[in-house]
């Protein structure tokens, strides 16, 4: 029997929470967990070079199947030698299934058992995405970690609808597993859905765990529900995933949500948040968010974050970065993007150390107090 493409190794459990320290072994290298994954939607993390991402400690990045299918097309990427060669990234890559993007086109799509009919958001042409097609595209892209095609229903959808949805997602997951051409080179994750309904999350997890995926994602969160709701769902969903498999919380990137996810046993996170807010001149700092384009920073010659040792904070001032952003200079966006990504990657590095030292709850409390978060969102341990 061949070795699975990806393997999770548990290194240490936190004594006081559900947090765990581990590593994920993939065909393109091993990365430590818990880990935040920068998002490179179109085979690039906006304005960042691969060298800069490595420099700041990004052990794995995410690319988007839907967008790469539309442009430049999976066949072209395959011809280039796969996504790693195409974008000159020699470390692990995770691709999503395209499902979230298709389902967010709510006024332009129709769901059937076979798959989803929708209109291309670029030119309005009719397209069809099935579980098999989503896997086929990802096989051609050559990512290390692939996602099953799933439906992501709105968090406030009715119980009856969500029940039908998770049952269909389970059938789609089974079809995707059968269609997967490279299980020895690419690991496929199942995605647990169920909105805020505990029994439906349990059913979804049970179905998927019975299929023995090498890893599992928790989907359908960070879609507008409160932090308390998200934590409530994680409290009963994460334990449903086997301990020997990686657990990935999709679309989460706020610092407090990362820490609270880790406390509940999550290993992997991704989000466009750090680069998206960076393009608007908003920076993550140890004191909370800083909107550097605001007038109060015009003559502020301090770094973005005086406690940060990233390249940006060692070399540039708030005043200079504000000037660049106010003048629509791309370099300003590069600087804020670099800093925000570094901030989250460094946060996760510190979280991993806190798990190693068995003081994650103390770390969380100190971080939240300095950042200004409401600690009431936390579960008591």
Curated annotation (Swiss-Prot):
Cofactor: Zn(2+)
Pathway(s) of this molecule: tRNA modification; tRNA-queuosine biosynthesis
Example of a GO cellular component annotation carried by this entry: cytosol
Cofactor binding: number and manner: Binds 1 zinc ion per subunit.
Family (UniProt): Belongs to the queuine tRNA-ribosyltransferase family.
Region RNA binding, residue ranges: 251-257, 275-279
Alphabetical list of Pfam families matching this protein: TGT
Active-site residues from the entry: 96, 270
Superkingdom of origin organism: Bacteria
Catalytic reactions on record: 7-aminomethyl-7-carbaguanine + guanosine(34) in tRNA = 7-aminomethyl-7-carbaguanosine(34) in tRNA + guanine
The enzyme's E.C. designation: 2.4.2.29
Protein's GO biological process: queuosine biosynthetic process; tRNA wobble guanine modification; tRNA-guanine transglycosylation
Disulfide bond as UniProt keyword: no
Full protein name: Queuine tRNA-ribosyltransferase
InterPro entries per UniProt: ArchSynthase1/Queuine_TRR, TGT, TGT-like_sf, tRNA_ribo_trans-like
Keyword Glycosyltransferase recorded: yes
Function (record text): Catalyzes the base-exchange of a guanine (G) residue with the queuine precursor 7-aminomethyl-7-deazaguanine (PreQ1) at position 34 (anticodon wobble position) in tRNAs with GU(N) anticodons (tRNA-Asp, -Asn, -His and -Tyr). Catalysis occurs through a double-displacement mechanism. The nucleophile active site attacks the C1' of nucleotide 34 to detach the guanine base from the RNA, forming a covalent enzyme-RNA intermediate. The proton acceptor active site deprotonates the incoming PreQ1, allowing a nucleophilic attack on the C1' of the ribose to form the product.
